Amino acid sequence: MSGTYGQLVLDAHTALFDRGDTGVLDTAFSENFIEHSPLVAGDRDGLRTMVEGAGDAVGYTNARVLADGDLVALHGRFTGLDETDLVGFDIYRVADGKLVEHWDSLVPVAAPNPSGRTQLDGPVKVDSSVDSEASRATVTEFFTRTLIDRDYDGFRRYTRDGVFLQHSPDIADGVDAVIGYLEDLKAKGQGLVYDRIHRTVADGQFILTHSEGSVAGVRHSYAELWHLSDGVLTEMWDAVTEVPADAEALHDHGIF
C-alpha cells in the first residue's frame, strides 16, 4: 500500500474482525459512520452486534491492502461471520483520521479453480513505481468497452499473448477461458450484465473496480481486482454477490 490511510484502516479492521475488539468502533470509527453492507443494519451498532454475536469464532486474515486518497480497499478472509468462511473485499472511506463509510462484497470460500488458483493467492506487494492513475485509466477503459459494452474480445486487446491468470473459482487461466465462460453464460440467458462502475481504488499496478449489474436478471455487486504488468492486464480476483434492491436493504444508505 502506498497511500496515507492504509495502515490506519487495516489496524482498525483487524482489531474488530480478527481480535473481536469492539472498542475500536468508538475510537477509530466516526460517530456518523455509514455502513452500506447488505449484511449489517445499524451502522456502528450493527457491526458491534455482528462481532459480539460471532464471539471467539471471529477471525480475519488479510492478503492485500490498496490505498487511494481517502479510500482503502482490503482483500481478505473472514471466519465466524457465517456458516462458512467468507472471502472478498472491504472498501473504507476515511475523513479526518476516522473511518466514515464502508462497502463490501463477500462470497463463500471456494475450492481452487480449474487452474489450481485460490481466491486470495498470487502477488500482494504494491509497486509504488507504477503510475496509479495510468493503471486506473487503462482498467476503466477496458472495463467500459469490454464488460459494460459486452465486447468480450477486449480481453484480447488489453492482454498480451493470451496470458490472463484467473482467481475466480469457476474459470481457468487464459483469455480464451474467460471469454468462453462469459459467452456461454450469455448464450444461456444467464449473462453477467454490468451497468456502471461506482468507484475504483487504484494503487500502483492493482486496481479494484466496485460496480453494479445483474446476473440472470438479479441485481449483483461486482468487486474485481485487476493486476497490470507493463500496462496490460495479467491477473484478476473477484467477489460477485447478489444484493437486494436499495428499498429492501437492512438500512437506507443504499448498497453502493
Where are these regions (language model features)?
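C-terminal and inter-domain tail/linker signature
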Residues: 1-256
